[in-house]
């Protein structure tokens, strides 16, 4: 894929700092000045790297200019220009399954029990980083505390290893409060409703404050943004936007600006020389949104098992990471936990996670860490579970469908058995082995309740009616 960075860098020509904002676009400062009573701690420029993981909500690859999209994303584009862009990174098709997979490094068939829920006792990358001596923080969206329908309470941020938290949807799915205007947020577990203000600005302030307060020690910041998830709203920079497309466009631009604010804070604090930043998305773009990518109209695939449902941006930036590189290596969300462990020199996690460390690939020491990705997708009540395995260009579904994928247009073309020859035959055989070697037994039907008239997960058990007649927040 050709380089796409010149327009983005030109848009930032008025600023010399990483992630800086041209004066004509700058908005009022959102952080109060620090008290002058005591000198600020000095930033670390050596030792274990700080690590920041930014997770945009409902954001596929077509949303980034550096990936061929047509949105205004100069700050994320600059991350790609100054770091490594991964062109074959994949999340689960929906937010809760993705977050469970991302945080625990395990396949969903092992520990995904219900939408908006992660069971207490699960070990997350927050625990891993805290065990490594890092100060850990999370700012943004949680959605793991419980679904509000079956009475179970999910894992807390504290139990997941986070020293500090500032979160939307910490509580059960209903009621959850606003993520945008007049936001509801819980600071270290204490909820507060604000009558005014834009939620993403509240989150950004907390993220920047966390960075500044902990600049003298290694920190891990997980920043699962609420942008660009629907509802489509006007942002402080797009107050005249009307209609879903225009408002979504403004939300993408605002998300990018907040990334720029974070990068500017790293530069201002002298932390850009010892901080690794990873930017990605939790699943494909909402299906109401159609975007252009390299001349192709790409409909969002959130919730679908097609490539548009799983294909997300993945950009790594920081010391020791090749600049301006585009990698074809496959990246899966199970890989993040072992990657962070590898980055911080922790012991191998063999047998405890399904992912593999991508650190050698990110650091430019290896070309690939895996040859295929497996997914078990059972997101919520009324969905029949699906299993599929894929590499960069081919996908095999558990029901036998074999497709060729175009990762740019997002089109999947079924390949009949009679046409599975040569390269297609080789990939079919390899993916068939992945499916055969991965979990294929019945799951506990109590974990995935089905409604009357739907097949049970376990054919040997009767269908249940748990959760029927309710909408478990599938758009979250």
Regions found by a protein language model. Name each.
Residues 21-25:
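Sec/Tat signal peptide C-region and signal peptidase I cleavage site
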Residues 8-20:
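Bacterial N-terminal signal peptides
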Residues 1-4:
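Positively charged n-region of N-terminal signal peptides that target proteins for export
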Residues 27-400, 405-433, 440-476:
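Formylglycine-dependent sulfatase
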